[in-house]
Structures are given as C-alpha cells and as structure tokens.
C-alpha cells in the first residue's frame, strides 16, 4: 500500500447505508476504513469489499468516547494513510411515543447521532485542516426534518 492511496473512514458501517457507502468508495479506489462498536460484525463487509478487488480495514470503536476516536484516527493515519474522506453514518431509532420517552433513552440516541458526530468530525477535521484538504460527510434520515409518530428522540437527534 502506498501513501498516495486515498483513505475513507466510515463511522457506522453497518449492513445498510454505511456498508454501501464503504463499498462505493472502495470501488472508486479508496482504502475503506470501516467501524462499528463490535469489530467482528464487520467481517462480511470486509470480505465483500476485498472480493470485489478493494482494500478494507475494520475497526471496533465506540464513537461516543473521545479517547477511542483519537486512537482510531491516529492508528489509521499512522498505519494506512491520511484520511481524505470521512463519512459519519451512526443513527439509532427506538420507536417510542413522546409521552413515554425517557430522558435516558433520549440522551443515548442523541449521544450516538449527535455527540459522536461532533467527536469524530472534530478529530478528522483537525488533520484535514493542517493538510488543507479533505471531505466530511454526514448521512441523515428524513425524520430529522419531518418527524413522525414514534420518532421523538430520533428526529431530535
């Protein structure tokens, strides 16, 4: 692997949107660095990217924890290469009426969808600003703009 290869970091590379984003970047020649809280769940995605001729690395990381985020970014930049593109794709919806929503659950959903986005984007942006290049992308759901029954915490995040 040469240092000239472009690296993408996809936070929240699950079985749907995040995984598809990682596959698309890999198809375009990026080294896909993908994360989930449980690294073992990334193996099917890594296998699929590699089978299609792409390069991929999986990392278990909790994006809500600043120390884990800092270590993740440092490891990727040191061992794989500079992160040229960053995609934040964490979201969680546990349907619940606003009347029954608990502060704890609301906070946990906000922590995953918002706070983790801040921590990870900040860590990557600090590197990108020094290099004067890079792209940061956030995915989102329409619940954030139009809400709906059972989406109080998810839409608020």
Place the predicted regions along the sequence by residue:
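Conserved glycine-rich cofactor-binding loop
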Residues: 14-16
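Conserved glycine-rich Rossmann-like NAD(P)H-binding loop of the short-chain dehydrogenase/reductase
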Residues: 30-44
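Rossmann-fold cofactor-recognition segment
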Residues: 52-67
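Active-site loop immediately N-terminal to the catalytic Tyr-X3-Lys motif
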Residues: 99, 146-152
């Amino acid at each position: 692997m040469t240092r000239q290869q472009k690296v993408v970091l996809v936070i929240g590379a699950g079985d749907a949107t995040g995984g598809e984003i990682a596959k698309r970047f890999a198809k375009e020649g990026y080294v896909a660095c993908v994360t989930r809280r449980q690294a073992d769940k990334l193996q099917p995605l890594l296998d699929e990217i590699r089978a299609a001729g792409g390069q991929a690395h999986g990392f278990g990381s909790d994006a809500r924890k600043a120390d884990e985020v800092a270590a993740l970014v440092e490891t990727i930049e040191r061992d794989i290469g500079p992160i040229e593109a960053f995609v934040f794709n964490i979201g969680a919806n546990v349907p619940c009426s606003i009347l029954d929503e608990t502060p704890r659950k609301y906070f946990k959903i906000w922590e995953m969808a918002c706070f983790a986005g801040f921590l990870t984007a900040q860590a990557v942006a600090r590197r990108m600003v020094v290099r004067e290049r890079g792209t940061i992308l956030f995915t989102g759901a329409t619940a954030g703009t139009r809400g709906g029954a059972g989406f109080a915490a998810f839409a608020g995040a």
